[in-house]
Amino acid sequence: MTEEQRGVPLSELSLQQLGELQKNCEQELTFFQDSFNALKALLSRNEKSISALEDVKVGTAGHTALIPLSESLYIRAELSDPNKHMVEIGTGYFVELDREKAKGIFDRKKEHIAKQVETVEGILKEKRRTRAYISDAFQTKVQAQLANMNTQQS
C-alpha cells in the first residue's frame, strides 16, 4: 500500500506555520547556495590544474618552478620529467600519470562537477521560487488579518 503525498495549500496555514516554513526554506536555500559556491570553487581549482598541466607541457627536464601547495604557500621544485604528473585521485591519494591520463582525469572531474553545479543550480531556482510563494502567502495572510482587525474596530 502506497500513501499518496498531498500538499497543503499555503492559504490554509497559520501565520506561525508560514513563518516556520519560510525559515526552513531560507535554511535550505542557504545550504544549497553554500553547496553551489563550494562546487564553483572546486571547478575553478580543477581548471587551474588543467592550466598547470598545459604550462608544464612546455617545460624541460631540470626546469625549476614554484609549485603551489595552497593558495598562499609555494615551494621551489625541479621538473624531473615533464611527461609525468602527480595527480590526486581522491582524499589525499596521489598517483603518477602521464600527461594524457592526467588530463583525462581532470576532464572527467570537470564534467562531473559541472553536472553537480547544474543540478544544484536547478534546485536553487526551485527553492527561490518556493520562497517567493511562501513570502507572498505570508504577506497576503498578514494583510487579511490587518483588514479583519480594521473592520472589527469600526
Swiss-Prot record:
One CC-aspect GO term: cytoplasm
Entry coiled-coil feature ranges: none
GO biological process: protein folding; RNA polymerase I assembly; RNA polymerase II core complex assembly; RNA polymerase III assembly
UniProt entry tagged with the keyword Chaperone: yes
Single Gene Ontology MF annotation: unfolded protein binding
Subunit comment: Heterohexamer of two PFD-alpha type and four PFD-beta type subunits.
Protein name: Probable prefoldin subunit 5
Gene source species: Caenorhabditis briggsae
Gene: pfd-5
